Amino acid sequence: RSGALPAPVPAHARKRPVESDESDGSLDACVLAKELGYTGVSSKACKGVYRSILNRARCAHWNGRAGEERYFMSAEDLIVQAGVSLQQDLSLATIIGCTHGERNGHHYVNGLAGAPREEQTRVLNAYPNLYRRGDDGIVRLSIRGGTIALGDLATIGFGSRAEI
């Protein structure tokens, strides 16, 4: 984080979209990154919902001034656990208009394996398109053809309608 932002993006790299990603360590990091030639910033729910919304507004404002869609946001989850935190992270990505996202948590965490079976069933019943039960009985994020169905999250409660 400390090594990336002090240096400007080299001229040859400015021909492509370059994202500040891990350097987004403060509320003004996105502004500093833009001044250094970065055109993108990542949204991570763990860094705060309001920061993502603020950065999305910044990108929209800068794009309006530039007259083109130059500035962008990506959605990343680091290691978000299945359940409410994943659902809210996906909801945030949708709110700020990210149609593609990097999902890592499902590679490192075994879905809802740590939750009692009854809780897993309640989550699966509340979000039947977002999760699936594996052959081993564990409820996990359902990824089909590289996509995640988000329709179950279009509900009151910022992605958390299940009684857990």
Segments from the language model and where they lie:
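Catalytic core of soluble alpha/beta enzymes
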Residues: 1-75, 84
